[in-house]
Structures are given as structure tokens and as C-alpha cells.
Design a protein with these regions (language model features):
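SAM cofactor-binding core of SAM-dependent methyltransferases
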Residues: 21, 26-101
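SAM-dependent nucleic-acid methyltransferase catalytic core
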Residues: 1-15, 25, 70-196, 211, ...
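Short, glycine/acidic-enriched loop or turn micro-motifs at the edges of active sites
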Residues: 35, 60, 170, 187, ...
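Conserved acidic-Pro-Pro-aromatic motif
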Residues: 178-268
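Short His-Asn-centered micro-motif
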Residues: 33, 56, 164-166, 183, ...
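Short, polar loop motifs at secondary-structure junctions
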Residues: 36, 150, 230-234
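Short, well-ordered beta-strand micro-motif
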Residues: 116, 268-271
């Protein structure tokens, strides 16, 4: 069974059972406009008779990794195995994108870089600065297993999947009646210390969440089903008050303060 090949902020591994125990009675395709680490997608894709799928993310680096694992998994694995696991190599690889030569890198090498930085970076964070450059420090780890077996399994799971790199709004034109759309946006922060939205150089604020609610309304009008995950907050509850809301608990592992990692309430919102 394929699993996410990256550790991703907001990843849904801890919520898989809650999400997948609440599917539509029937659906024709599975669409994920904000795929991130892809825990839900990989779980569905690894089942018998997996649904036709479309995954998308605005993060071009992430989508390149998906596309290269789909098309060239062995080349990605070879690149990963050739990289030393130490701070000197880490910072050399991390800062390579600041050089004009980075534009000449082959796409599978860039994909390996993404995975390498994710596995060896501090706490598995993906964070960029205002210029769009990855700026996570070395995590002081070695002996990391890049799990080539899982990369190959992920490649197999992706073979029948369409992979896109556009704004989630642009996915709307591809959504048809009978589709099941799973939305996992950057969560609305529930306090001043929990605002982590740097998946790309831009953030995701309350205005974006209101626009996402309108997106969900359009999905509903189109005759498709949606499931959405978000933080348990009064703003989110009010925003989606006309939909089916379930409160669940998830254990979060990406937090700079280890003492704050643990089970926290979240919501699963559905139009069915």
C-alpha cells in the first residue's frame, strides 16, 4: 500500500479513518484540489478498484515531485541514494535554487531535492521566505531511509491519476456531477501561534476561507459531493453552518514546540 512520500504540514494520516469512514454512497471520480502530502489519495488509490482520480496543488515544487515519481521513480531514487546525509550537503542542496544553474537541473533531480530536504529538514517542515526560497534549517538527522519501496508503490498508485498544478479555483471547470471532491486547505489559525500557511510564498487567510466556502457552494450546485477538513473554530462553524459538520480529533506532529503536539479538535464538513 502506497503512503505519502513526504511529511507535509496538515497531512491527513491521523484523520484517514475519520475521513474515509464518511464517503458518499457512490461517486464517479475522486478529486483533490489541494493534495499536499496525499494521504487520502494514496489510501484510496491503494484499494481494490481505485476510483479515477485528479490531484492538484498550487505548489509547483510539490507537483513536480508527484509527476516525477509517477514517470521516473527509479531516477528519483538514484538521486536520493547518491546524496550524503549531513549538514554541508543539506545546505548545498537547499540553497541550490538561488543559483541560475538550478534552472538547468533535470526535473527528476529537483524532485529528489524536494524529498531530501523534507526528510532531513527540521521537523519535516516545508517553508519558504518572501522570495519563495526554501529556508528550513538542517534537522541534525542522519540515517534517513528514503523508502524506495514506497516511492515505487506511490508511482504505481499515480499511474491512473491526472496531476495538475493550478489554483484550486481552476479545478472547478473539471468537476462534474457525481464527483467526490476532498478539500484540505491551510487551516484557519485558532490562535496566534498556530498560523502556519507557508506552503507557497502566499498565505491563506479568512478572506481565502470565505472564497473557499463559495467554491464549495458551487460544487454543491453542480451536483458533486465534497468533504472538507478544517480547524474547529467558531468562524469555520459559522461559515459552513448550512452543511454537515462533524467534530473529530487528530494528532499533529509538525509543531516547533514539541510539548504542543497532540490530539486537537478539527472538523470534517460535508454536503451529504
Amino acid at each position: 500500500m502506497a503512503k505519502p512520500f513526504l511529511k507535509w504540514a496538515g497531512g491527513k494520516t491521523q484523520l484517514l479513518e475519520e475521513i474515509l469512514s464518511r464517503p458518499p454512497e457512490s461517486y464517479s471520480r475522486y478529486i483533490e484540489p489541494m493534495v499536499g502530502g496525499g494521504a487520502v489519495f494514496f489510501s484510496l488509490a491503494s484499494r481494490n478498484n481505485p476510483p479515477e482520480s485528479v490531484i492538484n496543488d498550487l505548489n509547483a515544487e510539490l507537483i513536480n515531485a508527484y509527476r516525477q515519481i509517477k514517470a521516473n521513480p527509479n531516477l528519483v531514487i538514484e538521486e536520493l541514494q547518491a546524496l550524503a546525509q549531513n549538514s554541508e550537503t543539506y545546505y548545498h542542496i537547499r540553497d541550490a535554487e538561488r543559483s541560475p544553474e538550478f534552472l538547468t537541473w533535470e526535473l527528476h533531480k529537483k524532485a529528489a531535492r524536494t524529498i531530501y530536504l523534507n526528510k532531513l529538514g527540521f521537523n519535516g517542515l516545508y517553508r519558504v521566505n518572501s522570495s519563495g526560497f526554501f529556508n528550513v534549517p538542517f534537522g541534525k538527522r542522519s540515517g534517513i531511509d528514503f523508502n524506495s519501496t514506497n516511492i515505487l508503490a506511490a508511482s504505481e498508485a499515480l499511474q491512473s491519476c491526472e496531476i495538475m498544478n493550478v489554483s484550486y479555483v481552476d479545478i472547478l471547470q473539471h468537476i462534474l456531477p457525481g464527483d467526490w471532491v476532498y478539500l484540505d486547505p491551510p487551516y484557519l489559525p485558532i490562535n496566534e501561534t498556530s498560523n502556519f500557511t507557508q506552503y507557497t510564498a502566499g498565505g491563506f487567510d479568512i478572506t481565502d476561507h470565505r472564497a473557499l466556502r463559495q467554491f464549495c457552494d458551487t460544487i454543491t450546485e453542480r451536483g458533486a459531493k465534497f468533504t472538507l477538513s478544517n480547524a474547529h473554530s467558531n468562524q469555520i462553524i459559522e461559515l459552513y453552518s448550512n452543511y454537515n459538520i462533524s467534530v473529530v480529533f487528530a494528532k499533529r506532529s509538525i509543531n516547533k514546540n514539541g510539548a504542543r503536539r497532540g490530539a486537537i479538535p478539527e472538523v470534517i464538513i460535508r454536503n451529504f
